[in-house]
Amino acid sequence: MQPEVPLGSGKLKPCSDMGDIQRAAKFRSSQSAHMLLLLLASITMLLCVRGAHGRPTEEDEELVLPSLERARGHDSTTLLRLDAFGQQLHLKLQPDSGFLAPGFTLQTVGRSPGSEAQHLDPTGDLAHCFYSGTVNGDPSSAAALSLCEGVRGAFYLQGEEFFIQPAPAVATERLVPAEPKEESIAPPRFHILRRRRRGSGGAKCGVMDEETLPTSNSGRESQNTPDQWPLRNPTPQGAGKPTGPGSIRKKRFVSSPRYVETMLVADQSMADFHGSGLKHYLLTLFSVAARFYKHPSIRNSISLVVVKILVIYEEQKGPEVTSNAALTLRNFCSWQKQHNSPSDRDPEHYDTAILFTRQDLCGSHTCDTLGMADVGTVCDPSRSCSVIEDDGLQAAFTTAHELGHVFNMPHDDAKHCASFNGVSGDSHLMASMLSSLDHSQPWSPCSAYMVTSFLDNGHGECLMDKPQNPIKLPSDLPGTLYDANRQCQFTFGEESTHCPDAASTCSTLWCTGTSGGLLVCQTKHFPWADGTSCGEGKWCVSGKCVNKTDMKHFATPVHGSWGPWGPWGDCSRTCGGGVQYTMRECDNPVPKNGGKYCEGKRVRYRSCNIEDCPDNNGKTFREEQCEAHNEFSKASFGNEPTVEWTPKYAGVSPKDRCKLTCEAKGIGYFFVLQPKVVDGTPCSPDSTSVCVQGQCVKAGCDRIIDSKKKFDKCGVCGGNGSTCKKISGTVTSTRPGYHDIVTIPAGATNIEVKHRNPRGSRNNGSFLAIRAADGTYILNGNFTLSTLEQDLTYKGTVLRYSGSSAALERIRSFSPLKEPLTIQVLMVGHALRPKIKYTYFMKKKTEPFNAIPTFSEWVIEEWGECSKTCGSGWQRRVVECRDINGHPASECAKEVKPASTRPCADLPCPRWQVGDWSPCSKTCGKGYKKRTLKCLSHDGGVLSNESCDPLKKPKHYIDFCILTQCS
């Protein structure tokens, strides 16, 4: 859980330094919805913090008369001119409401929708209000404005931020662009334009301690540990020997458009404070956040959209909101589930929910918390939620920041990020202390990497569906809607006004307040809202005062395109089958001005260095990785001075096979020592699939990814099963104690020993045991039993044991046995006569069959393929009599002639099995019934339907039914 901590009380300075102050009139409910939309539009430019120590910013303001006109030849382009601060600011604006879903709805809790519709949205549909663009043609500038009820919003130009809003006397009037036939309009409506420059002060973001110790089976594992492949293409040196074609996965490492369908919730404190302007205010905040997530520095195509806004008018009908931020988050996460449709096809289904409140939130130590969210929960319906404290337009920063946590981003100063960010400053959105936002790269390399890895590992599948009817987000800059005075009121209360300070124009908002009975200026070190006027023809954009005429240079979106593939990187292993990568960047060109990010494969990978590794005392590669942690395990378990780690396979979920789960030898505790094994590590002992970036991908027995080659029953890669023979037997015993059943020689493959208890009994007093060649016991020796399923690693061979308490006690192994083992049965008490069956396969001898050694001999060729894959087939081979020179002969003894045919594929074929009929779908009239259809192997395992004979597939597994005629 990530609590967000601001700067505390903010920074103060004597009022004598602030010059003449004009107190803004109260700006109430008719504007608040509009304000909320603008605030949302600015979220991507804000952070989750609110107080810091830093130098003051420069800030001043002027009264201006905005002039709007349609651009000639461009029906959708609107030109806004502002004369302020001794310059002309020309804004070239385009409608921009992409953050609103077409099917966006506004709902209320505690009042009827009909009675509140007009109160919440007196201006009707707000989607047409919002615009974005550039200032004075500067491609590095940015603007986000609303042109409804006057000009409101913010813009950024050349290091200065501008915020514009109607002067209080005209706050409820409406300013709209002229019709296309009219060249311009300039109604005599004064606006307050504020300009601000950001200082070097920082905003602090506190987090709970992030555990990175090994995670036990009873603990909760962190999801934000970095992966192993680099952000940039590595150098080709030591790349390893590539093997086979490049493996390009269908879903892994693919840049796909993601749509974050969002529900915005405002509690009663928000409704009381913002009144009818609440909806617009929320959407303004969200539109700013949406623009941040469109920035190419996030290295993904992520669109934030609103599908629903819910306003709570009766406190008791909403989630319990208290000063305890963590408890409020838990309450909200639990409460919001009732408002979400379980079907992703529902237009009102949302992927994440955000609660906005005016309640002062507190963390575990201070009340400087501005927001809270869990990490990496975006597709978890129960935990994909955030809580935001609304303290003004800067709440947009908090929203972008908290959504970053939901997308699995840690803070930039977390140790996970050290290898990515290096000596990183605090100028990115996920910084724990923000000094100044780098608008050219709002997301740090670590943030981009963490969200990319998170999505590549399948944690964002709920974001793949494009919303049907998103609500349009406002395009107006927030500073055009809310002047500096109003921004101060949002942050410090209704009595606060803007403190003019030429040194902090656009960069830091200073507001009046009282301290010790004295009138002072105070700040929370956030810039003026974009769009706040900072001079004649200028306004604030991204903390800088820019000319409005430069808007044209960055108003046109530039869509990104992929650059060339880079060189192949280093192989993850020096032998035994590793993985190497090549990457490409979305830099040809880099997307700009809200242009689309590249879609398609960003990473390719392939197998490399597949040669056998030198013998390492029979240890597997996973064993080596577990043992590498022995020297770091200083904690004692019981009386043991240190811990020896061995791989754990039994009981590990299939989705966790590529985590390094190791067991403390002789103790039984197991932990996830690493979130991912090294690329190329086999997923399990009985599979040739390998791990790639924490995911199990198919590979052949030749260690090549996507290869179809398999081991046959003889353990030969790509073989046909003709080089070995099956050895089996059944043993019974009645004497107490340990008794040998069979000694399985080295080289045996596909070993299976089964001990079935009598029907209705879980144990009959007899148990399997394994003894090594040196007489030591590997399993169930010295009358000590292992009751649970486990994996036994012996000389590089993994033996899987079911546990003595299983109804079918079983020992299995698939790889060739390195040393002989003796299978025993332990009889205790008055045990019933056990029935134990064993099977394994051994390589055939290849000596020639000689009839007359000195003159001629029978010469045989390899067995051909079996005529069937199951159900009893035949194999043939050529058997010829030849002399010592290899010529055909007839002197061979016929009585010793080897057989030229033999039966094969003696295992029963997979069979179809149908289940019982389901109840009729209707209680009367004509309905239908169905039954399950499965393809089963000879031992009862479920196979894919393709494994069974399609000609024998039952045809009637769905049928009509009539229980009774309807009356």
Swiss-Prot record:
UniProt cofactor note: Binds 1 zinc ion per subunit.
Modifications made to the protein after synthesis: The precursor is cleaved by a furin endopeptidase.
Domain Peptidase M12B span(s) in chain numbering: 258-467
Keywords on record: Calcium, Cleavage on pair of basic residues, Disulfide bond, Extracellular matrix, Glycoprotein, Heparin-binding, Hydrolase, Metal-binding, Metalloprotease, Protease, Repeat, Secreted, Signal, Zinc, Zymogen
Pfam families from the UniProt entry: ADAMTS_CR_2, ADAMTS_CR_3, ADAMTS_spacer1, Pep_M12B_propep, Reprolysin, TSP1_ADAMTS, TSP_1
Cystine residue pairs: C333-C385, C362-C367, C379-C462, C417-C446, C488-C511, C499-C521, C506-C540, C534-C545, C571-C608, C575-C613, C586-C598
Active site (UniProt): E402
Propeptide: 55-252
Residues at which Ca(2+) 1 binds: E261, D344, D351, C462, D465
Glycosylation sites recorded in the entry for this protein: N547, N720, N764, N782, N945
Entry GO MF terms: heparin binding; metalloendopeptidase activity; zinc ion binding
Signal peptide per UniProt: 1-54
Region Spacer, annotated ranges: 725-857
Annotated Disintegrin domain residues: 476-558
Function: Metalloprotease which cleaves aggrecan, a cartilage proteoglycan, at the '1683-Glu-|-Leu-1684' site (within the chondroitin sulfate attachment domain), and may be involved in its turnover. Also cleaves COMP. Has angiogenic inhibitor activity. May play a critical role in follicular rupture.
Protein name as catalogued: A disintegrin and metalloproteinase with thrombospondin motifs 1
Organism (species): Rattus norvegicus
Gene that specifies this protein: Adamts1
